Amino acid sequence: MWWLAVLVAIVAAVGAYATWTVTRVERLHRRARTSESALLNKLDDRAETVLKFVGQPGFDEVVALALSVVAVPAETQRQRELREYAENDLTRALRELHPDPAWADDLEAANRRVALARQIHTDFVRDAVASRSLPMAVLLRLHHRLPRPQYWDIEDPVQ
């Protein structure tokens, strides 16, 4: 009868590990989705900050780029790619502006928030992608059930 107790203990341990793995993988994927939403909000906030300066000299191109950023949703893969290109164009245009104390602080703060949100999102996506290769996650085929999180390929706005 002792072998039955050992068998029950092994099954319980494997079941607990499987439950822990599923919970961890799902939690990391949920965090990646949440951080992507936060990144999109910070990118929208930066575009709105740029739109405050409509009519200022030298801001015509940057305002047009900010409008194109706001106009592109990120729901499909193609829209996401277009949004990445638009964000990169906006970042490059903002770098080319000569800083003016009237608006430089607002844009620097918005860029820092975007950079922080981008870094957090990248970290969560990295962790979620790594969790998909855990042996128990592969055995339970979690990589088929959960969509693979995607990195945002945007330039660092703080450089």
Please place each PLM-identified region on the residue numbering:
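A helix-centric hydrophobic-segment signal that preferentially recognizes long
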Residues: 1-159
